[in-house]
């Protein structure tokens, strides 16, 4: 009897020890999982010849999970815990490890802007953006809208695979300002004959990972887009994002990006990314009287201004509405670039940018107005 009690006590003790150990292991595993975040791992240029499999191994060996390897950026999107981040930063083949930040649409705020930038003067000459491909890197475009001609696209939002559905309405509004058709309904776009491509990188809440945006820009490069419109941005810089934006520009694409809706903060720049990168055309917003919108971001990186207050444009479901924002100003510049290229198809993206900036109407201090309001009639001379 005494022996039996001893055996039961021993069995209970072993069970208790096992349970505590298992619980501790589970807690450690849960702790590890909870610290995992999304990152972009960049490899050194000297490692550009490294195979995709080897790059994947470098990350996997540290406990990371590779989500995507980029085409034009020597980097990969991955999920990492803190330990993996520290180990990868020490790896001799790794150049950088940066958080895969989230960008947001710069929403919101009528075609008065079309006349304000002198687009009708080009229309009357027969230049309306024909044969120019514009990638709208945004929340998708409602391709069923009767006032839009969407020629193609792709989605890089994992949970929203249809680029022709726009849950936030932002991308559809942007698309209308660029190229709403010259017909008997709705509104008129800056370049009504331009070909629109829906490149979805923002979800229905208007947010998207930087890695999704990088994928979208890579798609635009691979599919020979002439103009990229990015009415989006974030407060944090990214080596990978800058690399792919620079690649797009070196590939001959005109890249217009919204400066942001952060207003001004003394002498501190409030321009967001990717607009802050020198290779982009950073666009601020003015109203119908050419006064800077109070929300328009300011900074030395600002390049030009365009209408961005109460801009009437297309919305999903065949409807229309007015939004405010540098998001609404930027497509005026993208559309203007398409108009110029339809008149001067041999011009380089650098020439298009130079003409837009050098012919802009001076409005005031460049910190707040850049070179001024774009004048596409003058730019296309």
UniProtKB/Swiss-Prot annotation:
Subcellular location: Secreted
Prodomain residues: 30-106
Entry's EC annotation: 3.4.21.62
Manner of cofactor binding, per the entry note: Binds 2 calcium ions per subunit.
Residues the entry annotates as binding Ca(2+) 1: 108, 147, 181, 183, 185, 187
The keyword Protease belongs to this UniProt entry's keyword annotation: yes
Protein name (record): Subtilisin E
Gene, per the UniProt record: aprE
């Amino acid at each position: 009897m005494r022996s039996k009690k001893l055996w039961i006590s021993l069995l209970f003790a072993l069970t208790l020890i096992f349970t505590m150990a298992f619980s501790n292991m589970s807690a450690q595993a849960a702790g590890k999982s909870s610290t995992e975040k999304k990152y972009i791992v960049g490899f050194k240029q000297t490692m550009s010849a490294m195979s995709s499999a080897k790059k994947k191994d470098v990350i996997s060996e540290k406990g990371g999970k590779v989500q995507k390897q980029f085409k034009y950026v020597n980097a990969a999107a991955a999920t990492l815990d803190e330990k993996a981040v520290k180990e990868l930063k020490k790896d001799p083949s790794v150049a950088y490890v940066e958080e895969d930040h989230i960008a947001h649409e710069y929403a919101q705020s009528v075609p008065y802007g079309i006349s304000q930038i002198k687009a009708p003067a080009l229309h009357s000459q027969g230049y309306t953006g024909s044969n120019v491909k514009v990638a709208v890197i945004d929340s998708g475009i409602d391709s069923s809208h009767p006032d839009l001609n969407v020629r193609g696209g792709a989605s890089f939002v994992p949970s929203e695979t249809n680029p022709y559905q726009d849950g936030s309405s932002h991308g559809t509004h942007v698309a209308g300002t660029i190229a709403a058709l010259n017909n008997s309904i709705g509104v008129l776009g800056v370049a009504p004959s331009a070909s629109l491509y829906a490149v979805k990188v923002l979800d229905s809440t208007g947010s998207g990972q930087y890695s999704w945006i990088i994928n979208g820009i890579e798609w635009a490069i691979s599919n020979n887009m002439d103009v990229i419109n990015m009415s989006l941005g974030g407060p944090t810089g990214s080596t990978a994002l800058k690399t792919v934006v620079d690649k797009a520009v070196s590939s001959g694409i005109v890249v217009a990006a919204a400066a942001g809706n952060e207003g001004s903060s003394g002498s501190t720049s409030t321009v967001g990314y990717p607009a802050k990168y020198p290779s982009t055309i950073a666009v601020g917003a003015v109203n119908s009287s050419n006064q800077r919108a109070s929300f328009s971001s300011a900074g030395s990186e600002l390049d030009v201004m365009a209408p961005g207050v109460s801009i009437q444009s297309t919305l999903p479901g065949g409807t229309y509405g007015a939004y405010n924002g540098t998001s609404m100003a930027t497509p005026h510049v993208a559309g203007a670039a398409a108009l110029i290229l339809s008149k001067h198809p041999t011009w380089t993206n650098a020439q298009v940018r130079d003409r837009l900036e050098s012919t802009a109407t001076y409005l005031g201090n460049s910190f707040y107005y850049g070179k001024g309001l774009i004048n596409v009639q003058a730019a296309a001379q």
